[in-house]
């Protein structure tokens, strides 16, 4: 492969980058609307950038929710989460934005988002956000 061809392929967004950039949360119909149940999703490789330093921040996201009429499609959720990797955003803002999007798209009965950020500079941070009313 020539150097010119290699340089050319790195200048435009690659197909994976385009898919991530265009991603949005997709939901499908809850297969059992009559039953109250919980779904837990782990996303252990979340990244965004610190808005002050530009350094990467890493976190494990845990989503637990009780679906109402819709259920989150996992691949779309993964791609949506990957879209934050190059965005300079605070921990508080990104977790609230993700929660807003989850609530607006899925309309769950109840949802809990936990974000456990890896330590940086000897400081770690964990955020927990809840929305809705948990049902028994």
UniProtKB/Swiss-Prot annotation:
Residues at which substrate binds: 72-74, 91-92
Arranged from A to Z, the UniProt key words for this protein are: Cytoplasm, NADP, Oxidoreductase, Queuosine biosynthesis
Q: Where in the cell is it found?
A: Cytoplasm
Q: Does the keyword Cytoplasm apply?
A: yes
Does this UniProt record's set of keywords contain Plastid? no
Gene Ontology cellular component? cytoplasm
Gene Ontology biological process terms, A to Z = queuosine biosynthetic process; tRNA modification
List the pathway annotation.
Answer: tRNA modification; tRNA-queuosine biosynthesis
Secretion signal span: none
Identify its protein family: Belongs to the GTP cyclohydrolase I family. QueF type 1 subfamily.
Protein's name according to its UniProt entry: NADPH-dependent 7-cyano-7-deazaguanine reductase
